[in-house]
Amino acid sequence: MSDSKEQRVQPLGLLEEDPTTSGIRLFPRDFQFQQTHGHKSSTGCLGHGPLVLQLLSFTLLAGFLVAILVQVYKGPSSLSQEQSEQDVIYQNLTQLKAAVGELSEKSKLQEIYQELTQLKAAVGELPEKSRLQEIYQELTRLKAAVGELPENSRLQEIYQELTQLKAAVGELPEKSKQQEIYQELTRLKAAVGELPEKSKQQEIYQELTRLKAAVGELPEKSKQQEIYQELTRLKAAVGELPDQSKQQQIYQELTDLKTAFERLCCRCPKDWTFFQGNCYFISNSQRNWHDSVTACQEVGAQLVVIKSAEEQNFLQLQSSRSNRFTWMGLSDLNQEGTWQWVDGSPLSSSFQRYWNSGEPNNSGDEDCAEFSGSGWNDNRCNVDNYWICKKPTACFRDE
């Protein structure tokens, strides 16, 4: 029995070889069956053991062959992928090399550096920004332009004037005068560009004459000192002016004085009230808006047209004192929402603030304006109200 067991086990040893193609080591010993412990013998099972192991070995070998074939077929595709990536890298390197080849040569870079150096030196030598330098440059260009013009007695005279003006400008002391002359020169330059016409020459000559007069009026240094002292004294005097409240008080006193003077010279008819050069009549009876307009016209006046905030405050006070609703000369009869005075003038936007809250609301065809409480209200024009007429004062001497 021992010899037969050795003969059965011997073929299994052949399966211990290492398959090089797969790289996996298989040990079939691990698959040998262990004899089970029990009361019965396992001789029947061992009789079929070699056949099962052979079938299992063939199955594993077939799996290894399939794996090897898959790797063989996959190899060329991965190689082609690596090749394509190398091609892309090569193309990028080629493009980069071409771009580097297009860069400026060293001599070009040197040339650019020299240009920059020269430019830096030139910028460093630029003169400081001054109005006199600009004027001098303008005069130089202007002189060149005039020098190229056809010979003419008037042009020659202009050239001489410019020469003298150039000398005078070089000694200009005042910045304000420099600015004035610079502006004149700017206009003169524009005119010289259009010189061919005789009328333009005449215009330039007149400009030069005025410019020469302006230069001639520049004060000497001694005069400048005197003017400076005068300005200093004036500044001190301005500093001593009364404060704003004092100024307001003085203004009010002057206003009162003017009003008193007007009353002495100008009078209003009986039962009329004077205010700021006008006479106002406040009715004691009531009429509708249209009849109120007619009543004012009959006495040579107008249903009141308000021209200022002061006048509005004065009239509003007169109306509120008597607690009356009073017509004014304002309506939107011609076009709804467009308010207009009886003299044809439109209602100023600054006067919109005088409407009472929520007014005008056109509630029931309300097209005429009235003084109501502390502001204005729109009401139906056929309602009877008091009214105010306005006309200018008549100034005369007592008989």
Curated annotation (Swiss-Prot):
Ranges in the topological domain labelled Cytoplasmic: 1-49
Residues the record marks as carrying a glycan: N92, N361
Domain (C-type lectin): residue spans on this chain: 274-390
Top-rank taxon, per record: Eukaryota
GO cellular component: membrane
Pfam families: Lectin_C
Localization: Membrane
Motif (Endocytosis signal): 14-15
Function: Probable pathogen-recognition receptor involved in peripheral immune surveillance in liver. May mediate the endocytosis of pathogens which are subsequently degraded in lysosomal compartments. Probably recognizes in a calcium-dependent manner high mannose N-linked oligosaccharides in a variety of pathogen antigens. Is a receptor for ICAM3, probably by binding to mannose-like carbohydrates.
Subunit organization: Homotetramer.
Domain notes: The tandem repeat domain, also called neck domain, mediates oligomerization.
The protein's name: C-type lectin domain family 4 member M
Species whose genome carries this gene: Nomascus concolor
